[in-house]
Regions:
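Beta-strand elements within well-structured catalytic alpha/beta cores of enzymes
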Residues: 39-44, 73-78, 163, 184-197, ...
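Internal, conserved structured core segments that host functional sites
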Residues: 121-175, 180
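Hydrophobic h-region of N-terminal signal peptides that target proteins for export
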Residues: 14-20
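Long, well-ordered alpha-helical scaffolding segments within enzyme catalytic domains
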Residues: 57-67, 172-187
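Surface-exposed, charge/polar-rich loops and edge strands
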Residues: 126, 130, 158-159, 169, ...
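Flexible, glycine/proline-enriched loop segments at strand-loop-helix junctions
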Residues: 107-115, 137, 164-171, 248
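A short aromatic-anchored loop/beta-hairpin motif
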Residues: 21, 25-132
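N-terminal secretory signal peptides and thylakoid transit peptides that target proteins
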Residues: 1-14, 27
Length: 296
């Protein structure tokens, strides 16, 4: 419910009487509560196995969860939910989606029982003007979300919802759409983009999967350029990644793992600080580089 709708709603209430209990009113106004501005994250989520391993990347996810104050909710834009149109999950209890194959049975047994937040989903729907946002009751939490958030909030005490990636639209479109989510930072919502900056599965060196900081030359070159643009605030170069040459073409053969980075960067305010963590490559053609945007 947006502010205009809320005011109209109040006008319909009896001036006296008990048509609405106080806790019900609080529930409706809760999305309007303002807090100190939350950080924004882009997380290089890597292999689903990170959900059950305890490696340096997992330790990085855990540490960033400890460094920032606990949010009222998490909104995640995951590489693994592409749709025709834009949707936000709006169920009370999102299911844990095991959207992968060929991994140990232990991984398929993992459940992340975080609640959803239908009220937040409705607020997002009503406040985004760039496109119509649908409320989705079928998806849940895919591994781009739960495999990293479970390390940040292992007790699953923070509600989590997802916003889908509309595969029909351009990087510029996604960047502009993300800007419409800015107000959520002041309402206690932690916004996370989850993907990988360099992500070319076809060129993975399967013999060196466990060798951290191993990358092909083209992957290193693309990664260094990306980091330069990120830290300098030159977002337009990142939006126009398809014009950046062969290294970027190899690093981003398909856009779904890259677009969540643009969502995070679009949410950066002028006076915010920005830093990198988990800044290493794996398997030759993947990077785990993650981004943290914070108030100064």
């Amino acid at each position: 419910m947006n502010r205009k709708s809320f005011i109209k709603f109040l006008a319909l209430l009896p001036i006296t009487g008990t048509a609405m209990k106080l806790n019900e009113l609080n529930k409706i106004t809760e999305p309007f509560d303002h807090t100190d501005k939350m950080p924004v994250l882009f997380l290089g989520h890597g292999s689903p196995m990170n959900a059950i391993e305890d490696n340096e990347f997992v330790q990085g996810f855990r540490k960033v969860g400890e460094e920032i104050r606990k949010p009222n909710a998490v909104l995640c834009i995951s590489a693994h939910w592409e749709t025709k149109g834009t949707f936000v999950t709006a169920m009370e209890k999102p299911k844990t989606i095991h959207d992968f194959g060929g991994f140990p049975e232990e991984l398929y047994k993992v459940k992340y029982p975080a609640l959803g937040n239908p009220e937040l989903a409705r607020e997002i729907k009503e406040n985004i003007n760039k496109t119509e946002v649908g409320l989705n009751l079928n998806w849940g939490l895919d591994h781009g979300t739960w495999s990293v958030v479970k390390h940040m909030y292992p007790q699953a005490e923070v509600p989590v919802i997802q916003l889908s990636l509309d595969y029909q639209n351009s990087p510029q479109y996604h960047y502009e759409l993300a800007k419409e989510l800015r107000s959520l930072r002041k309402k206690g919502v932690l916004i996370i983009g989850s993907g990988n900056m360099v992500h070319n599965l076809r060129m993975v060196d399967w013999r060196r999967l466990d060798e951290v900081d191993y990358s092909y030359d083209w992957a290193s070159e693309a990664s260094e350029k990306m980091k330069k643009f990120i830290l300098s605030g030159d977002h337009q170069q990142l939006i126009n990644y398809q014009s950046q040459g062969k290294e970027f073409s190899l690093a981003i053969p398909t856009p779904e793992h890259y677009l969540p980075l643009l969502y995070a960067l679009a949410l950066k305010d002028k006076n915010d600080g920005i830093s990198l963590f988990n800044d290493k490559a794996v398997a030759g053609s993947l990077t785990m580089t993650s981004v943290k945007i914070t108030t100064r």
